[in-house]
Amino acid sequence: MSQDFVEIAKIGATYKLNGELNLYPLANSIETLLSYGDWYIQLPATNVWQQLKGESVLKRADKVYIKLANINNADTAKKYVNALIGVPKRALPQLAEDEVYFKDLIGCSVKNINNDSFGVVVDIIETDANEVLVCKEDNSEYLIPYVKQYIVSEDLNSKKIVVDWEYDY
């Protein structure tokens, strides 16, 4: 399959002897995760996405479990531990002009208005107040609030972000 996929969940440890697995959403909420149509799976150590044949997805309190078709015991289910669940990028909702998917920020190079480099975005921390870009350059890590007052420009096609931020903030 040549289409781009977006990771929406990761499979965790087996949950029951009948082959159920823990499912960890990477989406903002369990409801968002469950709203996507067809899911695809990428097994550990492969780059191949295959359509997922799920038997059921169960939501219990704040946990989600998945039962894959034709997987009826924990031993067989173990090969799916750490697999990724994804959807085709085209399945995601269109964003407004000033919105981005956080996953598109990962890997962007970050420089300030003085052309000082903060490295690349390796993670995004979600806090109650705002999101924070985690940038790494060599052995240094920088935390930059992802708010309009500090973001001068973003070019996601070129994977470049310019910020109004200094090393000593």
Swiss-Prot record:
Give yes or no: UniProt keyword Transit peptide.
no
Query: Taking the first listed entry, what is the main subcellular location of this protein, grouped into a coarse class?
Result: cytoplasm
Q: Could you state one GO biological process linked to this protein?
A: ribosomal small subunit biogenesis
* GO molecular function terms listed in the Swiss-Prot or TrEMBL record: ribosome binding
Q: Which NCBIfam families match?
A: 16S_RimM (TIGR02273), PRK14591.1 (NF011185)
Which family does the UniProt entry place this protein in?
A: Belongs to the RimM family.
Instruction: Provide the protein name.
Output: Ribosome maturation factor RimM
Q: Which gene encodes it?
A: rimM
